[in-house]
Amino acid sequence: YEISLGLVGSEMCIRDRYTIGYDTAMNTVVEMVDKLRDTCHSHDRCSVVEVMGRNAGHIALNTGVACGATFVLVPELPYDLDEVAKKMLETKKTGKQNFIVIVAEGIGHSELIAKTLEAKTGIEARATILGHVQRGGSPTLRDRVVASEMGYYAVELLENDIGNRVVGMQQGKIVDFDIQEALSMKKPFDEKLYQISNTISI
């Protein structure tokens, strides 16, 4: 299901990975992390990047995979900074000199995480909180098209005196749900993708 609410973190959703604004937010984060990586590369440092999502780690996870982050920390799963530090040191032995750690805002404490990793590894680490810049910018093609489709469907519902509905997408088709039902929907965390993200990194 894809629920057509403007939630950049894609917190409310079942099965699929999409709410309006999510694709735009992810692309914004990827662009900014790519720029931070350039700085990390020139200064041989670790960048701890905190991204939005409230208590959902979907933005952190997907952008972490897209950016080849060294490690991704999300509120859905426990984490161990000793393991993060160990991975940094192991990859440093292979010649890698820069590291990206993506932190979901549901975890927070990015400054403390950066200081802890620097103390454990001896690698200079800096925290960057992207904040509300993730909510701005021009929407991506996907956000524009899906928002138009769902908006059109919503107007049709209103024209037929049907209210208190949330428009979504099921198996590629536009559908609608009772608003209370939609509010109770939560998107399951993709643990397999999380495993992939922390196994392969650039």
Model-based region annotation:
Residues Y1-I3, L7-I14:
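Short, small-residue-biased leader/transition segments that mark boundaries at the very start
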Residues S10-E11, Y79-L81, H132-G136:
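Short gly/pro/ser/thr-enriched loop/turn and capping motifs at secondary-structure boundaries
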Residues R15-T24, S138-R144:
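Short beta-strand elements at the ligand-binding edges of bilobed clamshell
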Residues I20-E124, T128:
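Accessory alpha-helical/coil subdomains and C-terminal extensions
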Residues T116-K120, G136-S148, V155-E159:
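Catalytic, metal-anchored helix/loop core of enzyme active sites in primary metabolism
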Residues E124-R126, I162-R165:
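A short pocket-lining beta-strand/turn micro-motif at the edge of beta-sheets
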Residues R165-I202:
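Phosphate-binding loop/pocket of nucleotide- and phosphate-handling active sites
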